[in-house]
A protein has these predicted regions:
Chain B
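Polybasic, positively charged surfaces/segments
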Residues: 1-284
């Protein structure tokens, strides 16, 4: 039985009879193949990536597992349509906080249409893409006081400037994201961002690969960050996880590194690192 | 003060049609005319800030020209000039390359007109595709015993393969103007490799760029220099220097991801040439 995913924070949503992704109860995420070249390009990427022997095993874990293209009943009632069958990266989480961050100081790339270029560069300049090398696309964060999710509107998120992005990254690891007038407590910063299995460690592993890989250019791709909030089990681990998603605009690297993604990733890492360090200082000062 | 035009300018402004260009003296100093509009002001502001910034580590300071303040120079009609270290004064036969770093040369604070001009130039060159472009270079030909410079127009149209070829020619000893012979990359390991070579220096710079949030080095170049007089004995005296700070802005707590991405890409190009030349020499 297929249903609309609960935890989508960015991208198309299968709501109100619109075409969008679906999930089953076996941990599979079905993404409808978009009509134009994008769906084809994404499938082509997954085919190439899943059989590429030059991708190290530890890096493969940062990408959703690929289960081919399958015919599935579309969410808008238009019948059986080809869908990309992927690992549902949030299945197995009870109450996940999720954040989608688009990496790179530009979302356009050489040889795109003038129309697409103008659309992209306008958005890149209006958001933090140009200034920070990344932008927050969407997020939902569990609030432990209200027992509900903070899910800012897409328009609010796209209007973030540098401070807004920083605050969102702090709220992402806070127990009180819904409290507007209070400073985010960054209660989970060291468990989620820090630690030997935390987000920062994973990002640094990805960074090392991006310093030399010339296989793919991940134009307009996002990094998804997920962690668990369910406290029904004592000392439940946060299980913070980084995944790369959205490969509709990936191109061959042709012997050149993905300097656009790499620069943005390094900038993102610096932001996370600063939050970890300031939260560690907070604890030392007894706040 | 005896001033003359510098011998080995490979990019940037030169004295032409009555407009002032840079000058050098015989005491190892380089005089750069203060560019009109705000650029000259920005460059001075950067040098003032940088030279007194105690948080810049000593091993990074070596990658920047020493600043000697500003001075009015008579031979240029009393025009104000920035006085810098002449990076080439200690070289007798330097090969020099100017590489503009970053996948974009524009920045948010610039005027719309400037942004559009840069976007066009960036797209036409290897800036967008590779994260850097070669602005110019001059290399000593050990067979012809003279300096060779590629045609400026030719350089503007090169693509990724052209960049690789230029980086190989830059460290070759064979006749450079002869396009039929392959560059021998004879000096690749002396110049690019080794514990004091270009690659080592670039990697040191990269580490600093992964954390520094003081400055955004928009449109800056990396200059690569080495000595031809001693290179046959394996002594390259290779040096990396950052130059051209007319568009530098405050980092405001954000790293210079634009420069860093381009620098990392450039490092890969240099490393590839070094490795393929190492492979070649083990096969010979």
């Amino acid at each position: 039985m297929l249903k609309v995913p609960e935890h989508q924070v960015a991208g198309h949503i299968a709501k109100d009879g619109k075409l969008g992704p679906l999930v089953d109860d076996q941990g599979i995420f079905y993404k409808p193949l978009q009509g134009d070249a994008r769906g084809e390009n994404e499938a082509k990427f997954y085919e190439s990536f899943s059989s590429n022997k030059n991708v190290p095993d530890n890096i493969r874990g940062y990408f959703p597992a690929y289960h081919g293209v399958q015919l599935v009943e579309a969410s808008d009632g238009s019948g059986q349509l080809p869908h990309l069958a992927l690992e549902d990266v949030v299945s197995g989480y009870v109450k996940p906080s999720v954040m989608d961050v688009k990496i790179g100081s530009r979302t356009w790339y050489p040889d795109v249409s003038e129309e697409y270029f103008n659309k992209c560069i306008k958005k890149d300049r209006e958001t933090t893409t140009v200034s920070l090398g990344f932008r927050v696309s969407g997020l939902k964060v569990f609030d432990h006081e209200e027992s509900g999710f903070w899910r800012p509107d897409k328009r609010v998120v796209l209007a973030y400037k540098v401070d807004g992005a920083r605050t969102a990254l702090r709220k992402f690891v806070s127990s009180n994201p819904l409290a507007d007038s209070v400073v985010p407590d960054c209660a989970f910063a060291s468990e989620v961002y820090g630690g030997s299995n935390g987000i920062l460690t994973q990002l640094l592993e990805l960074k090392a690969w991006f310093e030399t890989q010339t296989l793919y250019h991940f134009n307009s791709c996002s990094i998804l960050m997920v962690y668990e909030n369910d406290e029904s089990v004592d000392d439940a681990p946060r299980r913070a996880r980084v995944k790369l998603v959205d490969f509709a605009h990936v191109l061959d690297g042709n012997g050149v590194i993905d300097h656009n993604f790499f620069g943005g990733l390094c900038s993102f890492i610096k932001f996370i690192k600063d939050i970890v360090e300031s939260s560690e200082n907070c604890c030392e000062n007894g706040h | 003060m005896h001033l003359k035009a510098p011998e080995h300018q490979v990019a940037g402004h030169i004295a032409k049609d009555g407009k002032p260009g840079p000058l050098v003296d015989d005491k190892g100093r380089f005089f750069k005319p203060l560019q009109g509009d705000s650029r000259g002001e920005i460059e001075v502001k950067f040098y003032e800030s940088f030279s007194s910034n105690t948080e810049v580590p000593a091993h990074i300071r070596r990658y920047f020209p020493v600043y000697h303040g500003t001075q009015a120079v008579e031979s240029s009609d009393g025009a104000a000039m920035i006085v810098l270290e002449n990076l080439l004064s200690k070289y007798s036969k330097p090969s020099v390359m100017d590489v503009k770093m970053g996948s974009r040369t524009w920045y948010p604070e610039a005027s719309e007109e400037y942004i559009q001009k840069c976007l066009r130039k960036d797209a036409r060159s290897t800036t967008v595709s590779s994260g850097f472009r070669i602005s110019g270079f001059e290399v000593y030909d050990h067979k012809e015993l003279s300096f060779w410079k590629p045609d400026r127009k030719l350089l503007n149209g090169i693509k990724v393969d052209g960049v690789r070829l230029a980086l190989r020619k830059f460290v070759s000893s064979n006749t450079l103007s002869d396009t039929s012979s392959k560059p021998d990359s004879a000096f690749a390991s002396s110049v690019y490799g080794g514990s004091n070579g270009i690659l080592t220096q670039l990697l040191e710079l990269k580490t600093w760029f992964e954390n520094q949030t003081f400055y955004h080095f928009n449109s800056c170049s990396i200059l690569i220099i080495y000595e031809n007089e001693s290179i046959q004995d394996g002594d390259a005296r290779a040096q990396v220097k950052l130059v051209d700070f007319a568009h530098v802005h405050d980092g405001n707590g954000v790293i210079d991801h634009n420069f860093l991405g381009g620098l990392c890409s450039f490092i890969n190009f240099v490393r590839d040439i070094l490795q393929s030349s190492d492979d070649q020499s083990t096969q010979d």
